[in-house]
C-alpha cells in the first residue's frame, strides 16, 4: 500500500504551483526521518543534505527525527554526512528517537539539538536481527564485528554527550529509555521545545 503524501498549493508570481509537502519542506531546508533507518531512508536523507549544502552552505539544515532506529551502518552514514557537510545540522526529535536514531539526534550541531516535550529517546547496544546462521567461524566473525561496533558506538555517544565512557557502557547494556528532560540531562539534546 502506498503512502498518501499531501500536496501543497502556493501562489507565485507566475500563478499557482503545487508540490508534495516534503518537497515544500525541503525548500525550507527541512529534512525528515519518519520510520526505520534503512539503506533507502539513509540514501534519501544524505542526498537531501548534500543538495541543501550545495544550494547554500551557510544556512542550517533542520533534521526532524521520528524513528525507532534501524540499521547502525546506515545511521553512521547519515551521521558522517552531517559531520562532512559545512552546514550546521539542527536535530529535532518528534515522537521518538530510538537506537540508531538517537545517535543522529545527538550528532546535531552543539546548541542545536532539540526534542519536543513528549519525545522519547532510547539508547542500547547494537544487535543482529533475523536470526544468525552459519558456520562457527562465520558466527565468530559477526560477533567480533558486533563487539567492535558496540565499542565504536559507546565512544561516539560518550563524545557527543560528555558522559564518561564507563557510564555509557553500563547504560547501553540494556534498553535505556529517556524522556525529553532526561535526554537533556544526559547530554543527548540541548533544549526541549
Swiss-Prot record:
Keyword entries, A-Z: Cytoplasm, Hydrolase, Protease, Serine protease
Name of the top EC class for this enzyme: hydrolase
Cited Pfam families: CLP_protease
PROSITE patterns assigned: CLP_PROTEASE_HIS
The organism's place on the tree of life at top rank: Bacteria
EC assignment: 3.4.21.92
Claim: Hydrolase is one of the keywords in the record: yes
InterPro entries registered for this protein in UniProt: ClpP (IPR001907), ClpP/crotonase-like_dom_sf (IPR029045), ClpP/TepA (IPR023562), ClpP_His_AS (IPR033135)
Subcellular location field: Cytoplasm
SUPFAM superfamilies noted in UniProt: ClpP/crotonase
GO MF entries: ATP-dependent peptidase activity; ATPase binding; serine-type endopeptidase activity
Catalytic activity line of the entry: Hydrolysis of proteins to small peptides in the presence of ATP and magnesium. alpha-casein is the usual test substrate. In the absence of ATP, only oligopeptides shorter than five residues are hydrolyzed (such as succinyl-Leu-Tyr-|-NHMec, and Leu-Tyr-Leu-|-Tyr-Trp, in which cleavage of the -Tyr-|-Leu- and -Tyr-|-Trp bonds also occurs)
Entry keyword ATP-binding: no
Entry GO terms, CC: cytoplasm; endopeptidase Clp complex
BP GO annotations: protein quality control for misfolded or incompletely synthesized proteins
Catalytic residues in the record: 99 (nucleophile), 124
Listed PANTHER family: ATP-DEPENDENT CLP PROTEASE PROTEOLYTIC SUBUNIT, ATP-DEPENDENT CLP PROTEASE PROTEOLYTIC SUBUNIT, MITOCHONDRIAL
Assembly behavior: Fourteen ClpP subunits assemble into 2 heptameric rings which stack back to back to give a disk-like structure with a central cavity, resembling the structure of eukaryotic proteasomes.
Function comment: Cleaves peptides in various proteins in a process that requires ATP hydrolysis. Has a chymotrypsin-like activity. Plays a major role in the degradation of misfolded proteins.
Family statement: Belongs to the peptidase S14 family.
Name of this protein: ATP-dependent Clp protease proteolytic subunit 1
Species per Swiss-Prot/TrEMBL record: Desulfitobacterium hafniense (strain Y51)
Gene that encodes the chain: clpP1
